[in-house]
Regions:
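Rossmann-like dinucleotide-binding cores of NAD(P)H-dependent redox enzymes
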Residues: 132-135, 139-170, 174, 247-293
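N-terminal Rossmann-like FAD-binding beta1-loop-alpha1 element of flavoenzymes
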Residues: 110-132, 243-251
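Ferredoxin-type iron-sulfur electron-transfer modules and their immediate structural context
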Residues: 1-109, 196-213, 329, 338-340, ...
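Feature captures the FAD/FMN-dependent oxidoreductase FAD-binding
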Residues: 109-111, 161-210, 292-300, 339
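Residue-level detector of alpha-helix initiation sites
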Residues: 49, 116-117, 141, 240-242, ...
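Glycine-rich dinucleotide-binding loop and its adjacent helix/turn
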Residues: 82, 86-104, 165-182, 205-253, ...
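FAD-site-proximal beta/loop scaffold in flavoenzymes
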Residues: 212-232, 312-379
């Protein structure tokens, strides 16, 4: 690895990148300073088994690099780049994720429902201690949002599959085309396994607009079943990372894309990196705008202003009277949030937002069943999903050892 990159890190005593910036609490200063390549990989995988992925797609400016002490006097340390380089090098040189077998866990069986980032992390950390782990995945391949959400131009599938194979090499069994609420019964699994971790995400479309040629961004990105967007005018409604991914994907398919967002750019939940990359792709932005109706290619809009409301953490968009205007669109793609699959979680106690309710140990209302990631309403980034998987694996381990 480039020595200059290593030396740029100040090796701060307080480790803000690790303790304040990283949701997973990766041992960032340690893996940066470690000159032994295999030991550096060991440090990375002591907290995250998806370093090659997170090192490429994390919103660094909002997390580790955003609080980097170096960033106060210049550019922050390239933490993501270093992490990805360590993991890429490990795969090239055949380094494996280490095991730490606990004899008391070798007779235990755990089912992981959902093979996305959270499920993979939990599965890997249990398997490396000797637990017999089976992943149940609804698609014909693992990855979740990594393979059915994030576009190829942001994350190469080859990288994702190499990372997944490293985890599966720990001895994990996978059963594909298995979906809870369809051909997978939670009660039957409770009888077969000592514990279950539910990490199925929350990808059901939140369709808030009526009309033809309206699509869910989540569904388009998940199934890759795109209409012919070439030379068509497309509006993407939303301001998060999914909106940016959808807009850039449609732009790459030849569409004329405009993002419509009801707040200002500074209020966008998307990462700074994603917003800048979307602009670089020549996607147009229409801020402080609400879509009211869509009919026969006419999008009726109204301008908004942001107002402060008591008990609200964010300013709230308010329609401005007499500010209506129209846009033209052949298609509208909605990226205004997603919802849990109601059928899949019908037997669980829910929180006030409709997600599965868990306690501080990630336990649900069902016996032996834990849950994490988007399905419990966790912040929708890969790093937070991985963090849930790591924490849940520790809680499941303690549960199994009782």
């Amino acid at each position: 690895m480039n020595q200059e990159k290593r030396d740029y890190c100040l090796n701060c005593i307080h480790k803000p990148c690790q303790l304040n910036g990283c949701p997973i609490k990766n041992r960032i200063p340690e893996f940066i300073k470690e000159t032994d390549e295999e030991k550096a990989y060991e440090i990375v995988t002591s907290t995250s088994l998806l370093g090659a992925v997170c090192g490429r797609i994390c919103p660094f400016s909002d997390q580790c690099e955003g609080v980097c002490t170096r960033g106060r006097i210049g550019e922050p340390v390239d933490i993501g780049g270093i992490e990805a380089e360590i993991c890429d090098n490990a795969i090239k040189k055949g380094f494996k994720i280490s095991k730490n077998i606990n004899p008391e866990l070798q007779s235990k069986k755990v089912a992981i429902i959902g093979g996305g980032p959270s499920g993979l992390e939990c599965a890997g950390f249990l398997a490396r201690e000797g637990v017999k782990v089976t992943i149940y995945e609804k698609h014909s391949e693992l990855g979740g949002i990594l393979t059915h959400g994030i576009p190829e131009f942001r994350l190469k599938k080859e990288i994702t599959m190499q990372t997944i194979n490293q985890i599966l090499d720990l001895g994990i069994e996978v059963k594909y085309n298995q979906a809870i609420g369809e051909n997978l019964n939670i009660e039957e699994l409770q009888n077969q396994y000592d514990a279950i971790y539910l990490a199925i995400g929350a990808n059901e479309p939140n369709i808030t607009l009526k009309g033809n040629n309206i699509y869910s961004a989540n569904e388009l990105l998940e199934y890759r079943d795109f209409p012919d967007f070439k030379d068509k005018k497309v509006i993407v409604n939303g301001g998060g990372n999914v909106a940016m991914d959808a807009a850039r994907t449609i732009k790459h398919l030849g569409g004329d894309v405009t993002i419509v967002y009801r707040r200002s750019e500074s209020e966008m939940p998307a990462s700074k990196e994603e917003i800048e990359e979307t602009k670089a792709d020549k996607v147009k932005m229409e801020y402080l705008t609400n879509i009211m109706e869509y009919e026969k290619n006419i999008v009726k809009c109204i301008k908004t202003e942001l107002v402060e409301l008591e008990n609200s953490k964010r300013k709230v968009p308010k329609n401005i009277p007499n500010s209506e205007f129209e846009l033209i669109a052949d298609y509208i793609v909605l990226a205004t949030g997603s919802l849990p699959n109601i059928k899949a979680i019908e037997n669980f106690e829910k929180n006030e937002k409709g997600y599965i309710k868990v306690n501080e140990k990630y336990q649900t209302s069902l016996e032996k069943v834990f849950a994490g990631g988007d399905i419990i309403g966790t912040n929708s980034t890969v790093a937070f999903a991985v963090s849930d998987g790591l924490k849940a694996s520790k809680e499941i381990k303690e549960f199994l050892l009782k």
